[in-house]
Amino acid sequence: MTLLETTDIHQNLLSYDYYKLAANPSFGLERAATLIQQARAQYPNNLLLDDGDLIQGTALGDYQAVVNPVKCASTLAVHKVMNYLKYDAGTIGNHEFNYGLP
């Protein structure tokens, strides 16, 4: 069994810094997705987990929480990507509470 783990994604879905308006290949879930796919091909018996701090930290997080809040029945962009990558489980981080509770 191989454990694959991510943490502190903070809505960094793309390798792009929206505050500096510039590409930044040092972060982004898209970058991790490539590594996840490679690891899954090499180790087929695996679990993909996340340690939390998903929804706060970028302009996208602020937009989906404050400007145009996502309803409880809808899915945040980061969760759509995680569903696409087929995460097996995740935990709640402290930043999941930055915007309060619905």
Predicted segments with their positions:
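N-terminal catalytic scaffold of extracellular/periplasmic and nuclease hydrolases
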Residues: M1-P102
